[in-house]
Swiss-Prot record:
It comes from Legionella pneumophila (strain Paris). The keyword Glycoprotein does not apply. The keyword tRNA processing does not apply. This is Ribosomal RNA large subunit methyltransferase K/L. Its EC number is 2.1.1.173, 2.1.1.264. Keywords: Cytoplasm, Methyltransferase, RNA-binding, rRNA processing, S-adenosyl-L-methionine, Transferase. It is found in: Cytoplasm. InterPro entries: 23SrRNA_methyltr_KL (IPR017244), DNA_methylase_N6_adenine_CS (IPR002052), RlmKL-like_Mtase (IPR000241), RlmKL-like_Mtase_CS (IPR053943), RlmL_1st (IPR054170), SAM-dep_methyl-trfase (IPR019614), SAM-dependent_MTases_sf (IPR029063), THUMP_dom (IPR004114). GO terms for molecular function: 23S rRNA (guanine(2445)-N(2))-methyltransferase activity; RNA binding; rRNA (guanine-N7-)-methyltransferase activity. Residues 44-155 form the THUMP domain. It comes from the Bacteria.
Length: 707
């Protein structure tokens, strides 16, 4: 007797799965997105459950029928002879997918199917199966599409990628069946049969190495677990199942060489060994803590297969280029005669390898579309895009510009006791980056390219930028931090992009300031406001100084070092704590200064304090949930300035600044106050190329305008 089946898989593996299933005896009737339909006898079904390395679920199709309405779904499920699938004493769960005009909720759909099953058994013998949503013995799938309901029984009860050996995983785990697909695309079974070795230099929790060992040693993945739902199937033949399990165990064979996994993280290596032990392949593999640049082959021939980091968070992709360049160099230099298969979602990182791929395959790591690049490592596969490769004509122009800027600005910065400054700001339009120096680090902020620029050109320029900057500026590649700068809205202005807690201390005049180059779009210090901060460093002792929207209060540090008494207001607790750290770093007594966590607009409305100098530097736009209202600086600057002026002593000064490039000051403010545009006086040497970086105004009461 043959049974109808649907075997699901990860997106992109359909035809690879078809080949595997045919080899296991399935008569394939249709290949569809994310799965294969076919017919099989009971022995073939058991072999599919034991041997498939690519499948997610193996579903026995029970029935299908027209079911546009709730009553029709219930009737179909009531009429089916469920006793041919399981008995009433089993626990069940329903997974429902799809919708119709009447059934728009999957929970509702599952309820209808469950009710139909329960009603059938009650009518049959007065008893009913219980529901267990966590770990049912019988899992039923119901799919409703185009008013056709298809119902099937999950023969295994869980996704087959859950082999059972991986109790814990690393930060970016690779599904076991996707790892198997990588190995099959790289022709690992054929290479293993020829005695090839294998090395994963980014092994993490060991999935690729373990799957490779299971393939090479002919270990059926289904042997690792004995909790398949098929044991509760009414037509299950336990003697046949045990016979096929025994035959699978007899096919296991030893390996001529150990397969190797290495990783720079020692903790994850311990986890990899534990996973290998649970998979029963620990004697076949070797896991070591080793950085990439120390990796060397243990055999003359082999396969390097890996899933290196490919940076899906903001700024990470380009930051990983040096790692991929190192991988390409290591492969080319040390692994001649080997094959390689490398998975990445980024074409930029693939190009950074500098090696030509023989073939590319599309795979999906979860929802993420990736490419598997298969390479032959030989002398004929020349290494390109290395950090020391010859520069293109355009890249040479960039090098010359950076070198010129460096020679000029380094002397100026040293003379003024400045260790952080902007050295480049899209001086050459085709290289649309801003580059800021922080001690011996360089932060590259990539402006989002316009849609008119082809992707491959933008990628080429990114690689050239990373090739040129270390040479021209004398910066170690590992000290390049790359972010993408774009027009920011609301909370994006201080968007967190990671968590490293890596802080760096920089110098600006007499002040020492803390910056974080990794975790946020901004570093904690707005370089374009340097001259304003240095102006506050000249305040008279005892000056009452208010810093509204204070951020990390770097301006207040300068004022406090001059002897001013500062009040610092910001909505962010994170930045206020950072501000306090800045004060402590400079040995400033915190008891003489205030750090207030408030919505600045609301605080200015209610406070009765008076100040001699106020620095008002709000974001261009903010819609933080903690604010009482949306802040739009073009719309709201009049009310903000009026509130700030109310807090000034009669002879006080307000400095209002904004980075909104198209900002226009409301003319009526000039009628009410003495307003002076001091923007040119606040643009330092490193921002002369971009004089519209901000607008700054000095505002006083009219009768003090001449003072």
């Amino acid at each position: 007797m043959n049974y109808s089946l649907f075997i699901s898989c990860s997106k992109g593996l359909e035809y690879l799965l078809e080949d595997e299933l045919k080899g296991l005896g399935l008569h394939v009737t249709q290949v569809s997105p994310q799965g294969v339909y076919g017919e099989a006898s009971l022995p073939v079904i058991y072999n599919l459950c034991l041997w498939s390395r690519l499948a997610n679920r193996i579903q026995l199709i029970l029935f299908s029928g027209h079911a546009a309405k709730e009553q029709a779904v219930h009737q179909l499920c009531t009429d089916f002879h469920w006793q041919t699938v399981f008995t009433h004493d089993k626990t069940i769960a329903i997974e429902f997918h799809g919708a119709s005009e009447q059934i728009r909720n999957t929970m509702f759909g599952a309820q209808i199917v469950k009710d139909g099953i329960v009603d059938h058994f009650r009518r049959l013998n007065g008893s009913r199966p219980s529901v267990d949503k966590e770990k049912p013995q019988i899992l039923i799938h119901a799919h409703l599409k185009n008013d056709i309901l298809t119902v099937s029984f999950d023969l295994v009860g869980y996704s087959l990628h859950q082999r059972g050996y991986r109790k814990k995983a690393g930060k970016a785990p690779l599904k076991e069946n996707v790892a198997a697909a990588m190995l099959l695309r790289a022709k690992w079974p054929e290479l293993a049969a020829q005695g090839y070795g294998l090395h994963d230099p980014f092994c993490g929790s060991g999935t690729l190495v373990i799957e490779a060992a299971m393939m090479a040693a002919h270990i059926a993945p289904g042997l690792l677990r004995q909790d398949q739902s098929l044991q509760y199937w009414a037509r299950h033949q336990s003697s046949l199942w045990e016979k096929l399990r025994t035959q699978a165990l007899q096919q296991v064979k030893p390996l001529a060489v150990k397969l190797v996994g290495t990783d720079a993280d020692g903790k994850i290596i311990t986890l990899a060994r534990s996973n290998a032990e649970r998979a029963g392949v620990l004697p076949l593999v070797e896991f070591n803590t080793l950085p990439l640049n120390a990796c060397r082959p243990g055999t003359k021939r082999g396969l390097v297969v890996c899933n290196p980091p490919y940076g899906e968070r903001l700024g990470e992709v380009t930051q990983l280029v040096p790692l991929y360049q190192q991988l390409g160099t290591t492969l080319h230099t040390c692994y001649q005669g080997w094959q390689a298969a490398i998975l990445t979602s980024s074409p930029v990182l693939a190009k950074a390898l500098g090696l030509r791929a023989d073939k590319q395959y599309t795979l999906y790591n979860g929802p993420l579309e990736c490419k598997l690049y298969c390479l032959t490592l030989s002398a004929a596969n020349k290494l390109k895009n290395t950090p020391d490769a010859p520069l293109s004509d355009n890249a040479q122009m960039l090098f010359n510009r950076l070198e010129k800027n460096r020679n000029h600005l380094q002397k100026w910065a040293r003379k003024n006791q400045i260790t952080c400054y902007r050295i480049y700001d899209a001086d050459l339009p085709e290289y649309a980056y801003a580059i800021d120096i922080y001690n011996d680090y360089a932060v590259l902020q990539e402006y989002a390219p316009p849609a008119s620029i082809p992707v491959h050109k933008a990628e080429k320029r990114s690689l050239e930028m990373l090739q040129v900057v270390p040479r021209a500026l004398g910066i170690h590649p590992e000290k390049l931090i790359v972010k993408q700068r774009k027009q920011q809205k609301g909370s994006e202005q201080y968007q967190k992009i990671g968590k490293t807690s890596q802080r760096l201390i920089v110098t600006e005049g007499k002040a020492k300031l803390i910056v974080n180059l990794y975790d946020y779009l901004d570093t904690g210090l707005f370089l374009d406001h340097r001259l304003m901060r240095l102006k506050f460093a000249q305040l008279e002792p005892g000056t009452r100084f208010l810093n509204c929207f204070c951020y990390t209060a770097s301006a207040s540090v300068h004022a406090a070092l001059a002897g001013a008494l500062t009040t610092n207001v910001d909505l962010s607790k994170t930045y206020l704590l950072w501000a306090e750290d800045n004060f402590r770093l400079n040995d400033i007594n915190l008891s003489k200064h205030q750090f207030l966590q408030y919505d600045c607009k609301e605080w200015m409305k209610t406070t009765r304090d008076k100040f001699d100098v106020i620095f008002l530097d709000p974001p261009s736009f903010s819609n933080s949930k903690r604010m009482s209202d949306i802040l739009d600086i073009q719309r709201d600057h009049v009310s903000l300035i009026n509130m700030a002026m109310r807090l000034l002593n009669p002879d006080g000064v307000l400095y209002f600044s904004t980075n909104l490039r198209q900002f226009k000051l409301e003319p009526m403010l000039k009628e009410k106050y003495a307003v002076q545009d001091i923007t040119p006086q606040t643009i330092d040497q490193d921002f002369k190329r971009n004089s519209k970086i901000h607008h700054c105004f000095k505002i006083v009461m009219p009768h003090f305008a001449d003072n």
